[in-house]
Amino acid sequence: MNKSVEKDDKLEKNSSFPRSVLSVSRVEFGLREDNPEAKYCPLKLLVKDGKQLPSGLQGHVFIISATGSVDSKSRDDNKDIVFPSSDGFTPFYNGDGMVYRFDFDNLEEGVFLTTRIAKTPCYYADAATNKCQPNLRFKNRGIMRMSDELGIRNQLNTGFLPMKFSQEDNERLLITWDIGRPYEIDTKTLEAVTPVGWDRDWRAFNPLLAKLPLQPPFPFKLVQTSAHPCFDENTGEMFTVNSGRSLSTFIAQLRPVLYWAFGLIDSIRNPSPRGFQKAPDQKNFFQKLAAAFKQTIHLLWSLLQSFNIFANFVYVISWDGKEKINKWQVTHPNGCPIAIKQSMHQIGLTEDYVVLMDTAFKFLLEEILPAPNEPKYEEIEKWLSNLIDRPQLPDSTIYIVRRTDLKSDVKKVVARQVVIPRETTHFLTDYKNPNDQITLHLAHVCAWDVAEWIREIDFSNSDNNGGLPHMFGMTVGPLDISRMGCYVLDAKDAKQIKVARSDLTGVYADNQPNKYCQDTQTNGKEYCKYTWGPALYAYRENPPSGHFENIYWSFFGCWEDIFTEEGFQMYQNYKYRAIPADEVRQLTKKGIKSNLLRLHIADLDTLEANENRLQIQDAYEFDTGYFGNSPQFVPRAGGTGGYIVCVVYNGTDEQPDNGNEIWIFDAADLKSGPLCKLWHPQLNFGISVHTTWLSKIGKRTASYNIPVKQDYEYLVKQQPQEIQEFFNEWVYPKREPKDSGDCSVS
C-alpha cells in the first residue's frame, strides 16, 4: 500500500496530531572544512509540486530544535533516526540542540541546508560517559538531563540572538535555552565556540544543584537564565538574567524516600526466594545503609534550604561582546530579593528600561528528582505527580529596571513591580518609551501549560489510541481560548495606563472580534477559531517607527491526542476562564486546526472611539492533520515586504518526505497559502522551536573566547581522580568516542 494513502486514512480527524514529530535525525550535514564530523554534504532541498522559489528570498534562516540525546532509542533500520520521548517520560524539549541553517543566498543553485549539534563541554561528557564510563552517565529527568556525579547538561536547544556590534562587519549569533549559559556560535561552521561569561560568573539555580553536602561541587551546575536575551544595537549591549530560588516544596524532596519505603514494603510482601539460598552480602548491606544515611543528610539539608528566602535571586547581566560580563542583583524597593516562582523565559528591552517577567513556563525542581522507571511504580508516580504538580500562575508579574541605574560602581538595583492579569510565556516590547511609557505585546497562554507534557502514566494500558502511537513528550494542548494583549505601562509610577481597548479575545460575547476572525461552534455558541495556543512569533526587525506594527503568530490549535485528564482537572477552575471547561473538552475532541496569522497593532493616534488597537488582518489555516510551527520573517530583496518561512509537520516519518516540510508564504498574503514547499528525504525535524534570520554569514573573527580547561579547572580539581582523568581525556580535548573500542584509547 502507498504509505501516503495509508497515512491519510489514519489521520482523518484534526484531533490526530502529526506523528512525524516523534522521530528526529541526529545527522550533521555540512562542508568537511567547516565541520569534520559532518556525515554528509549540505542538503539541496527539493521544491514540491513544480513550484518556483520566490526570487526575493535572501540571506539565511536559522531554526533550532531539540534532537534527542546520545542514548535515545534509535530506529532499527537507521541508527541516525531516534525517538527522544519513546520512554514515556521525557519531554521533546529535553535534548541536544540542533542548529538548522537554510541558505537562500544563491537561489540559482537552490536552497541548501547545513546542520550541527551544539556541542558544549557537557555534551562531550555525556557522549563519553554513555560509552565508556557508565557510572558517571547522564539520565533524563523531566526537562533536564543530569548525572549524579557531574551535574546538569546545558543543551542549548531553544533560541537565538543576533548581535551586530558597530566595530564588526558581520553579525554574531548566540544560541540559548532557559537553564544554561548562552553560547556564541560561528555562523558559517555552526560550531559552539564560547560561552558568555566564565562559569564562576554565573550563580547556580539553587545550592542543591551546585554542591551536595559531603561532596565536591558539580563540574556542571544548573544555571537559570532567559532563552530570549536582548541586544541593543544602538549601545552595543547584550542583556540577559541569572536567577534562582529556594526549593519550591519540601514534599518534592520526599520522593526518593517514599520510593525507598515502597520498595522495602514490596520486598517484605514479596520476598525473593533466592534471598534465602545464601548468606547476606555484608558489604552490600553496609553500602545500602551508608547510602540511606547519606540520603537522610541530604534530605535534612534540603529542608533547611527550602526555608532560606535568601536563596532567591535575580541578576541583570550586560555584556559588550569583548570584556567580562557585568551584573547587578535586582531587589524590591524594601531591599528584599525578588523571587521568580516559575521562569524568566523572555525579557524585554527599551531605550531606557530592562523589562523582566515571571513567565508561564514553570520550572519545578521536583521534576529532576529520581523516580524508578518501572511499571510497578507507575501508580505511585502518578499519585506523587498529582500531589506535587501545580498550575502555572494565572497572572503576569513584571519587574521594571531603569538602565541608567546599571552603573559599574553599584551591585544592586531596585525594580518596580506591575501585575497584568493572565499569564504569558512570550512577549515583546517596543524599543521607544516616550514619556517613560513602555508598550508590551503579550500572548496570554490562558490555561495552556507548556511545561506539561504527555506521559505514559497519563494513559491506561487499555487505551490503544486508535492504533496510533501515543504523543509521549509532546506539550499538552490549551485548555481555554487565548487572548492577545498590547499594554502601556507607566514606568515611573509602575502601573498600567488605559489608552485604548488593547486586548483581543475570541469570545464573541466578551468582545466582537474583527470581521476577519472566522468562528467555530459548540453548543450553539461561537468562538474565534484562530486564537487557541499562541506558540511562536515572527516580526520585521527594527521597524523605523520604533514600535511593532505587525506580529506574525503560529497558533497551536486543539488536538484530542494531546489532551490529558490530569491537565483538565488542574485547570478546570482556571481564574480567568472564558469558555466553560466542558465546552473546551468538546472543542478539543472535535479539533481546532493549527494556523498562522498576522496581528496588526494600530497606532494610537489613528484609533476611533472604542476601536480595538489589535486586529487579525490575515490568516492561514493549515489543513486537517497539519501543524505549522517556527515562523520567521525574511525581508524581500530589493523591495518592501517579505516572506514567512515556517516548519510544517504532517503524517508520519514513514512518508517519503518524513512528514517534514518548509513552507514559504508571502508575508502580506498568508490567506492565499504557501508560495512553495521545500523537502528532502533526509530532512527529519523534531519539534522545532525559535528562529532567526541573518543577511549574511561569515567565519567568526571576534577574539572573545573562554577556554574550556580554564573555565572548569577550579571545579574539576576538587573532584575524585577518576573525574579529573575523565575531563583530561574527553572533555578538555573535545573528544567523542564513536564506539566502545575508543574507550581504551588515551
Where are these regions (language model features)?
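Beta-propeller domains
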Residues: 1-746
